[in-house]
């Protein structure tokens, strides 16, 4: 039974690129995936990103002197419908739970922008440059806005509350903090096999949630929704690689035999025997060393004495000791 999922390849690499905009943009490359899983995961994550994450938006507006959305506001060039359309574009980040009432109060000629919203410590305006309306000379504007948290899209008729003040206009609310999501699937290579998938996702947010966090939340949502379909107890199984502890070797084993400061005769004997590293030397027995050309008892005793000082000896069994190439790569990394 477990072969159904244990034999599937799992993604091992996730690269993230933000182009210097970590709060609003993220590009994510994930590979390798089983063939077909790129579209499966990309489409599912995209739908969740756009529909299911919490955000904040204006749900109703009340303007002094205005009773309904088809009115005009004295001293304002735009009509109420245009003002509402502009208000829908204002993005917020809420620092506390519950609906919050924010206001706009401005007098005189000039532009009214989202930066004029007085939100206090609980409501942060993320795009203060967003245009709301234009005031004429001697105009006076006072506007109350209700900001709430939610997910997805909520039509105006669902933002009507009981006993709300006369003149309160409910508006459509787009809560989603994700502005855009795209994904592509290309080929990935594992060894000589080239028909795996690589999933590339690009996420643009309004800044209230970072794209990498948004992707993580979406994956968590999918995981929680799918759990109910698992009708068996999952056993924690350790793989053979996990059971077999990685051996720990004495650091001296990775040193060159040149560092032993042997006599010229002994050093030349090791060179002729193609022994470069101490780890290679200690795996030789005394009998094997004595068979080396020009290698005598004096050289043997010299080497044994130095190895003893290092806590080593000839004839050691070193299971899974790295190859010469691996040793050389390790030494290069440490340089």
UniProtKB/Swiss-Prot annotation:
**InterPro entries per the UniProt record, alphabetical:** DNA-dir_RNA_pol_insert, DNA-dir_RNA_pol_RpoA/D/Rpb3, DNA-dir_RpoA, RBP11-like, RNAP_asu_C, RNApol_insert_sf
Give the CDD domains listed for this entry: RNAP_alpha_NTD
**What EC number(s) does this enzyme carry?**
2.7.7.6
Which top-rank group of organisms is this from? Bacteria
Which BP terms does GO give this entry?
Answer: DNA-templated transcription
Q: GO CC terms on record?
A: cytoplasm; DNA-directed RNA polymerase complex
Per the record's keyword annotation, is Nucleotidyltransferase included, yes or no? yes
Q: Which reactions fall under this protein's catalytic activity?
A: RNA(n) + a ribonucleoside 5'-triphosphate = RNA(n+1) + diphosphate
Class of enzymatic activity (EC top level) = transferase
Citing just one GO molecular function, the answer is:
protein dimerization activity
Description of its domains: The N-terminal domain is essential for RNAP assembly and basal transcription, whereas the C-terminal domain is involved in interaction with transcriptional regulators and with upstream promoter elements.
Similarity annotation = Belongs to the RNA polymerase alpha chain family.
Q: What is the stated purpose of this protein?
A: DNA-dependent RNA polymerase catalyzes the transcription of DNA into RNA using the four ribonucleoside triphosphates as substrates.
Q: What is this protein called?
A: DNA-directed RNA polymerase subunit alpha
Look up and give the organism this protein is from: Syntrophobacter fumaroxidans (strain DSM 10017 / MPOB)
Q: What is the lineage of its organism?
A: Bacteria, Pseudomonadati, Thermodesulfobacteriota, Syntrophobacteria, Syntrophobacterales
